[in-house]
């Protein structure tokens, strides 16, 4: 595809896509080799997600994670959390489920069929054919596995197939793990937006990343190669 510069007229078929994409993304199930993304259901998923994100020991099959610092491993750079009780997490997830311009998906491990994390399409702007991947977190049982790599690949493949031109990834500028992950997966760094938010009583500067539709074929090949040479999930080591 052509690289578009400022002022470049867009083809009629590109402009027409804006009329076909809803503000709230349609529910969808995306299935990969190790993980599947399904619309999050509080009754089905919330209790298990809470049990795997509150700092208490986790056991999943033969894999075990000892007690860990949930704030450090999961919640430090997110808008809310950690959550002492299930009700708090459920309220947080419900806001994402009902967001008028987003879609909340549960990351499920296919081998066990159980939840290990949450990903979202957020800030959907069909008028400009752009969308963001955000509010992403994983239980320590799924960290240092293929979960984020495969989930991100599935999310990107889906929206570029729908005709989006731009997918964004934003994170706290201090979140070095997220910034490193974005670059590894082929997002391009665009800069830092200073004083973007006040979160949990502190200033947040935001690092911006993106992939454009004409870049996607190259990025998809990169992600496919990464998945092919990454070994299947091993027992994770907590990083408390």
Q: Where do the model's predicted regions map?
A:
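GNAT-family acyltransferases
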Residues: 2-145, 158, 162, 202-240
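Conserved GNAT acetyl-CoA-binding A-motif
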Residues: 161-170
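Conserved catalytic-core motifs of GNAT/GCN5-like acyltransferases
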Residues: 170, 188-202
């Amino acid at each position: 595809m052509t690289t578009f510069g400022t002022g470049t007229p867009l083809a009629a078929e590109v402009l027409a896509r804006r009329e076909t994409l809803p503000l709230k993304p349609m529910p969808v199930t995306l299935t990969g080799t190790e993980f599947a993304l399904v619309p999050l259901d509080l009754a089905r998923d919330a209790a298990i997600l809470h049990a795997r994100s509150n700092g208490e020991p986790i056991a999943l099959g033969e894999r075990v994670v000892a007690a860990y610092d949930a704030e450090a491993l999961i919640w430090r750079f997110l808008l809310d959390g950690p959550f002492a009780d299930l009700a708090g997490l459920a309220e947080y997830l419900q806001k994402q489920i009902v967001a008028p311009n987003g879609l909340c998906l549960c990351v499920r491990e296919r081998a066990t069929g159980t939840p290990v994390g949450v990903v979202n399409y957020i800030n959907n702007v069909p008028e400009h054919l752009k969308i963001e991947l955000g509010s992403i977190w994983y239980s320590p049982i799924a960290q240092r596995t293929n979960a984020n790599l495969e989930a991100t690949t599935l999310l990107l493949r889906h929206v570029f197939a729908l005709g989006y031109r731009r997918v964004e990834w934003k994170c706290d500028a201090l979140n070095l793990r997220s910034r490193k992950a974005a670059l590894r997966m082929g997002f391009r760094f665009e800069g830092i937006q200073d004083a973007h938010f006040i979160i949990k009583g502190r200033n947040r500067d935001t690092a911006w990343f993106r992939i454009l539709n004409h870049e996607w074929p190259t990025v998809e090949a990169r992600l496919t190669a990464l998945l092919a040479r990454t070994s299947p999930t091993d027992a994770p080591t907590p990083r408390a």
